[in-house]
Amino acid sequence: GNDIATAKTLVNAYQMILPGEEAKTHRHAPHALRVIIESEGSFSVVNGEKHPMETGDIVLTPGWCWHGHGHDGDQPAYWLDGLDVPLTHLLEPMFFEEHPDGFAAVERVSPDSPYRFTWETILKRTERAAADTEGHFGRRVRLEADEMPTIGIYVERLEAGQSTRRYRHSANVVFSPMMGSGVSTVGDADIPWGRGDTFVAPTWNWIEHHAIEDTILFSMTDEFLMRFAKYYRFEAAA
């Protein structure tokens, strides 16, 4: 089988692009995103719109959008890819197409693309976010990705020394710290983490986080797919 899944519905992988490299324009059924770990000068082109991919950005590639990427900088760039490929394999609407021109023409350059959440925006939005009154999460914001209904995207801010209240729910979640360090407990496993790491909380495992440093924690989840199907359950620890 195609045993690549990070969770039942989600897959993640790290990617490096070297200066001068380009990926030809293509499209596929799965929805995708990138969390940019280290980059100066790389870019993405989605449906003819070119925008930067800089350190700390989150970049979207909704299913069946023409897209490619390249790198005009002078140092390697690194990011974390996240897709719903396992779900697409299960349901079987897997399609892929290369652009007939190889590299599609850039129709416009837009640093403020709706497919890009900048690091500056993420910092500002999490600073303004309200605290979770139940204590399960940090100051958390859901990023808008209406064209990608199978993947929910969150960023949350945890202060140094902050611990969250333990919970479990019927959704898969992949976490990646964008800033800071800490330890999370998933099920019975204690997982130390730092910037650029990735760890997964499969469905119905207890989850809690402890931040050692001020932290911005990215997560992607199938929670909203579960809500749509009326499968979603949430339980807080006593």
Roles of regions detected by a PLM:
Residues 11, 73, 152, 171, ...:
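Exposed loop/turn and edge beta-strand positions of beta-sandwich/beta-sheet ligand-binding modules
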